[in-house]
Amino acid sequence: MDYGGGFEDHELREAQREYLDFLDDDQDQGLYHGKVRDMIGSNEHRLIVNLNDVRRKNDKRANLMLNDAFAETIAFQRALKDLVASIDATYAKQFEEFSVGFEGSFGSKHVSPRTLTASLLGSLVCVEGIVTKCSLVRPKVMRSVHYCPATKKTLERKYSDLTSLEAFPSSSIYPTKDEENNPLETEYGLSTYKDHQTLSIQEMPEKAPAGQLPRSVDIIADDDLVDKCKPGDRVQIVGIYRCLPSKQGGFTSGTFRTILLANNIKLMSKEIAPTFSADDVAKIKKFCKAHSKDIFEHLSKSLAPSIHGHEYIKKAILCMLLGGNEKVLENGTRIRGDINVLLIGDPSVAKSQLLRYVLHTAPRAIPTTGRGSSGVGLTAAVTTDQETGERRLEAGAMVLADRGVVCIDEFDKMSDMDRTAIHEVMEQGRVTIAKAGIQARLNARCSVLAAANPVYGRYDQYRTPMENIGLQDSLLSRFDLLFIVLDKMDADNDQEIADHVLRMHRYRTPGEQDGYALPLGCSVEIFATDDPNASDVTDQELQIYEKHDNLLHGPRKNKSKIVSMQFIRKYIHVAKLIKPVLTSEAADYISQEYAKIRNHDQINNDSARTMPVTARALETMIRLSTAHAKVRMSKTIERQDAETALELVQFAYFKKVLAKEKKKTDKDLHDENLSQDTLSQESVRKSSRRAGKIADSQDDSMDPYSFSEQDSSLNENLSQSLRPQRKKAESQDGKRSLSQNRTKEFKAALLKAFKSSRSQSVAVSQLLELINKGNPEPFERSEVKEALDNMQNDNQVMVSEDVVFLI
């Protein structure tokens, strides 16, 4: 009998014997003998064999396996069944056949869908790509048993097609009558079926030639390989390349359809959980103890070290990566633990770069953009299967990022309809679909990090934050923190940013050749299913800090060290396992401060805040406190955690930290009162001397024991003597150019005056009253005139006939 590859019976037996010798290595290292025993113990029927081991022991068989895969695989599978029968005979009878999967180095047979050519037909190949489509899993009949009630006989039939390893496919006609035309009944319980699925994989976009569409290839997966991967996964699939004749109108055409019969599927996607060693955990604990007081600042400064500044935003991103505690109450209510952050600001303030850093740091992160995403693309869509015509559900970005982070850039470019679709996800953490007869609920417990530009392109200082943001309150309240990032003109800060950016451009990664740039996100290709250096990576020591480099860390002699991204990733993974408990002290503090924030919001008439202060702000403070406690590896949430959370909330809501005013201790207040008392006593002494001189020149009609008269006269004399001096000084100041601080104060007061008057033009006399209302240091008319002249030169205001117009 011929077995497809020109194998006679004696050649097949010879190959089977050699493969049996390879597997039965009990006298040698016992590697595959142990693997077969593990396979029996776990009730499986597929053994994964490394081609490098076959090549080491029998080079001839390894080459034949790559070039004539059908016959060699049949021989290998029979050898495996013989070995299983010798170890456990009863287990060998449970399965029709035992399968073999391959891994290791494939050399020239390691290809992409574009490089699959006719010369590789019948060969064992390894194909890399992205899964684009998965069909439904369907049963495929392998052996059917039929019973004839008339003759009391049973009939058995085996089936094989071109997707099996058999050389000659059997007839696909399903028997319904026997030779004498007696009807047959199918015994479904005795028939044998196996799972069958079709996949399509496409070549990776970064490896496709520029300007050409990526190519794809169909994969046939059977038995235990079904549902090994889902659409979007990057995979390496090892299998036998085969062609199938395509029929058109009942006739076989000259062109063939090619498929890959898979025997091993390996995911290339990033592992969600990093690998840990005992030394790694010990280093994390030691690092936490060494920086117990400033660990939050230390880690947040090391986030995105290539971006200068943005301290509070980096702290918020660190809290977002850690998250709070999710709670599901007895009545079914879910309190989310995910932290959502929105960045709004001028162009070129590194918003997108922060998003890019989170994509590389978070264990699972999905990037999307505002214009490139629709509502169903973010949540879920109901589509029609082209093969069967059935409706099916396709998961969107937020469902794929379950327990991860979704980064949405250009959030303001999305339509209102699409933005409304994510309301449920951001608060409830799930997507509910009721379309086309499908009622489904999908989990989407993810944090949202979004970046947007203001309504007018750039932030307008003369409008309220709510007018600049231009998003609905219902959406804004679902974001825990909203940061307004402004591109302020400051010479010192601009100089620091310029130095920092230029250093980044001069910095070069170790091992990079002169004049050669690696493609973005690309590394050296390895033509094997496993990286030979992978064991070295896991065994090498975990570096806590980045190695010092003058270009990366700067020329200044600062002692600040940057924590490495690998260490931060592992630290976050360990810290997320802790579930801190809220203490009564922290709970009382949070409730008091929440009431103060609501009160401050009401007093300021909503003009200063960036987003509505609702009951969700209370949950935000609890979540941020929990995240800060996780950074400290603490099992309880204490007052210091709540204070840090309050700082972040105040900075996000009011663009400034309000708590600094309230942090004065009793000693500070006592010292302040003493200094005020001494100042008033000195002024009284000076005025009394002057008053004494005046009194000597006048009649001595004052009663020395009448203290009230004395005080009133002293105060009167003091005010009279100080008033002309102050006016004189102020007039002298008015002649000189206004100081920078005084100009800033005037601009802020002018903006407040225009907001209170609610008009675009105000008379100068009325403006003077509005500016000096409640101002401890009132502005003189000359100061106002000079400041208005300066602003008019800068095209910020226009003054005409003593009326100020806001441009």
UniProtKB/Swiss-Prot annotation:
Catalytic activity line of the entry: ATP + H2O = ADP + phosphate + H(+)
UniProt-listed Pfam families: MCM, MCM_lid, MCM_N, MCM_OB, WH_MCM3_C
Chain positions of motif Arginine finger: 477-480
Entry-linked PROSITE patterns: MCM_1 (PS00847), MCM_2 (PS50051)
GO BP term, pick one: DNA strand elongation involved in DNA replication
Bias (Basic and acidic residues) ranges: 664-673, 727-741
Enzyme class: hydrolase
One CC-aspect GO term: nucleus
Residue numbers spanned by region Disordered: 664-741
Main localization (coarse): nucleus
Keywords: ATP-binding, Cell cycle, Chromosome, DNA replication, DNA-binding, Helicase, Hydrolase, Nucleotide-binding, Nucleus
The MCM domain, residue ranges: 295-502
Enzyme Commission identifier(s): 3.6.4.12
Compartments where located: Nucleus; Chromosome
UniProt biased composition (Polar residues): 707-723
InterPro entries found in the cross-reference section: AAA+_ATPase, MCM, Mcm3, MCM_CS, MCM_dom, MCM_lid, MCM_N, MCM_OB
GO terms assigned for molecular function: ATP binding; ATP hydrolysis activity; single-stranded DNA binding; single-stranded DNA helicase activity
Record-listed ATP binding positions: 345-352
Summary of the function given for this chain in its UniProt record: Acts as a component of the mcm2-7 complex (mcm complex) which is the putative replicative helicase essential for 'once per cell cycle' DNA replication initiation and elongation in eukaryotic cells. The active ATPase sites in the mcm2-7 ring are formed through the interaction surfaces of two neighboring subunits such that a critical structure of a conserved arginine finger motif is provided in trans relative to the ATP-binding site of the Walker A box of the adjacent subunit. The six ATPase active sites, however, are likely to contribute differentially to the complex helicase activity.
The family this protein is said to belong to: Belongs to the MCM family.
Name of the protein this chain belongs to: Maternal DNA replication licensing factor mcm3
GN (gene name): mmcm3
